[in-house]
Swiss-Prot record:
Function of the protein: Intercellular signal essential for a variety of patterning events during development.
The organism of origin for this protein: Caenorhabditis elegans
Molecular function in Gene Ontology: peptidase activity
Entry protein name: Warthog protein 6
Keyword Acetylation: no
Length: 593
């Protein structure tokens, strides 16, 4: 008896542990469709199923029963994202450390006509009910649950993202039977076998109509005519290449879900930039000697009066010596003593193929009253420039962002504010983890990109923005703001946070004061209702996002100390970024920069 009691207790204990480790959320099988999902107070999901009558799934005596042509896969730890799939079952397994969600994906041909309705978030104690949709008193569609994703929100609570699709109803079985002729059971079977075996006399000629007659398929190239000519030559049929849908080139460095263009053809530096209209005929000078010295002195806006005559008739010919010292239109001219004696002097590195006999009056290039601070630094070919150390890639201060508390100017944002952004395919709020740049007195040049309906955004040259072709079903791609063209489409959000395309109608340059570059946890941000990126380098976007996320976690340990003051609150780059990126330059290839 003691052994039996111990065995009985062991069975009860094992059953309790097994019941706690595996939670069955239900399965619809192949004869029903999921339409309802509930999440209990403990965060465990349960789905409910229904056999919609508008799809012909009914077992009543008045209608002929029909079974959906559905094929289901076993439970796997995946999301049913294919076009013809829905989530038919859920199983939650506790492996000791965390709970994993496994789904049963079923495929049905009728899902090819289904359309996306919405995506909702379900937390503990919440539910969603879909089902039959009626329009004008008739059944028009069925709202079903297609995709289910398990996430954890900012409060460390389980949350499920449910994708709801609407599948249109088919014609009922009664209406389809009324349209068919009244045939016996044997004749109905023969009618169904016509297309496969072609053995029914009533529809015997349906294949012969599709094929050309034998005489036309074997037509001779020469035909006898009852005329003065013996033969008549037929023209050969032109063979054309069949139409095939073009495919985009595959790029192994592409990042999901973006589509990138193929690499451009290599070309020489400053190719096709020589101005042919200003070329004048003149005598060719002798080749320069080997003792040429490069002169890198900048051009002076003051016009130097030359010591030699300026008319074409009095202009001296070039000397026939190896130490020829000509004049270059972009540099100051030499004085009279140096020019007449022809001594060896410093010359510019660039020497044109010939010198025109007549030199026009020097016109100094227009110099602006100020130089933007960010443009003088250039685009540095190292990681310091990519992480924001040398190239300021930012937004203008008058741009607006949407937060959970309402609309704010981008210059008024603070670390921790949740702004509207994109997380994969969902429009959601993401926290601002730091500012790459936040300088109120910085003067910069911005690209003002506008659409016909009033949307606009201001970006510096190398800041990334999402664009695509204005055709339907075109992929998104990240390009620099200076590379946006008039034929491109940018992506804006509506009042209901739905992303749509808008064609660019105007691109201009503006000068404004103040640069701001907030960094969100997702790496993207919606500014002035326009989707853009927080970064300035496409190849290292993931590296930049990972670097700043790790820095934020590490610096939070020292943030509460009295002697530590976070530089990100002041708008500067994090402490030590330039040192760390200089070390990373030794390990990361320059081809990624």
């Amino acid at each position: 008896m003691t052994l039996l009691n111990l065995f009985y207790c062991f069975c009860l204990l094992f059953g309790a542990v097994l019941a706690d480790s595996i939670h069955d959320g239900g399965s619809c099988g192949t004869n029903s469709i999921p339409y309802k999902m509930e999440v209990d107070s403990e965060g465990k999901p349960v789905i409910s199923c229904e056999a919609p009558s508008c799809l012909g799934v009914s077992s009543s005596a008045a209608r002929r029963p029909r079974v959906l042509d559905v094929s289901c896969d076993p439970f796997k730890e995946i999301v049913c994202v294919k076009d013809l799939q829905w989530t038919s079952g859920l199983v939650e397994i506790n492996n000791g450390t965390h709970r994993t969600l496994k789904t049963e994906c079923c495929s049905y041909e009728g899902m090819s006509d289904a359309k996306t309705i919405k995506s909702i978030f379900l937390g503990p104690g919440q539910s969603f009910v879909g089902g039959m949709v009626e329009k004008d008193g008739e059944q028009s569609g069925f709202d079903l649950i297609k995709e289910i994703r398990k996430t954890v929100n900012a409060d460390n609570q389980v949350q499920y993202i449910v994708g709801v699709y609407r599948m249109p109803c088919e014609a009922t079985s009664d209406s389809s039977e009324e349209a068919l002729p009244l045939l016996s059971r044997n004749r109905r079977k023969l009618r169904d076998r016509v297309g496969k075996y072609d053995d029914y006399e009533e529809d015997r000629n349906y294949r012969s109509e599709r094929r050309r007659p034998f005489a036309m398929r074997r037509r001779a190239l020469l035909q006898r005519l009852e005329d003065m000519y013996d033969d008549y030559d037929y023209e050969f049929r032109v063979v054309r290449r069949p139409f095939r849908k073009s495919r985009l080139p595959y790029n192994e460095n592409a990042l999901w879900p973006l589509q990138y263009s193929s690499p451009q053809r290599s070309r020489t530096f400053a190719d096709n930039t020589y101005n042919k209209e200003t070329v004048e005929s003149g005598p060719l000078p002798p080749p320069p000697s080997s003792n040429y010295i490069d002169n890198v002195a900048p051009a002076s806006p003051v016009v130097q009066s030359p010591a030699y005559p300026q008319t074409p008739a009095e202009m001296p010919l070039p000397p026939q010596s190896g130490s020829y010292s000509g004049s270059y239109s972009g540099y100051p001219t030499a004085d009279a003593s140096q020019y007449n004696a022809y001594p060896a002097m410093q010359q510019p590195a660039y020497q044109p193929a010939y010198q025109p006999a007549y030199q026009p009056a020097y016109q100094p290039a227009y110099q602006p009253a100020y130089q933007p601070a960010y443009s003088a630094r250039g685009y540095s070919p190292n990681l310091n420039g990519l992480f924001g150390g040398t190239g300021m890639q930012c937004f203008s201060g008058d741009m607006e962002v949407e937060t959970e508390d309402g609309i704010k100017m981008i210059k008024d944002l603070k670390i921790g504010d949740k702004v509207l952004s994109m997380d994969e395919a969902f429009v959601t709020y993401s926290p601002v983890i730091m500012f790459l740049h936040k300088r109120d007195e910085e003067i910069a040049e911005f690209n003002l990109i506008e659409t016909a309906n009033g949307h606009s955004i201001k970006l510096t040259d190398n800041h990334l923005i999402y664009v695509s072709d204005c055709r339907t079903r075109s992929d998104l791609k990240l390009v620099a703001a200076k590379e946006v063209k008039m034929d491109d489409c940018i992506h804006v959000t509506t009042d209901s946070n739905v992303v749509i395309k808008k064609k660019v109608s105007k691109i201009s340059k503006v000068i404004e004061t103040g640069i701001y570059s907030p960094l969100t946890s997702t790496g993207d941000i919606i500014v002035n209702r326009v989707l853009a990126s927080c970064h300035s380098n496409l190849a290292l976007k993931s590296l930049q996002q990972t670097f700043f996320s790790l820095y934020k976690r590490t610096s939070s340990v020292f943030h509460n100390l009295m002697f530590f003051k976070s530089s990100t609150e002041e708008g500067d780059l994090p402490v030590g970024v330039e040192t760390l990126t200089s070390v990373m330059d030794l390990f990361i290839p320059q081809s990624f920069v």
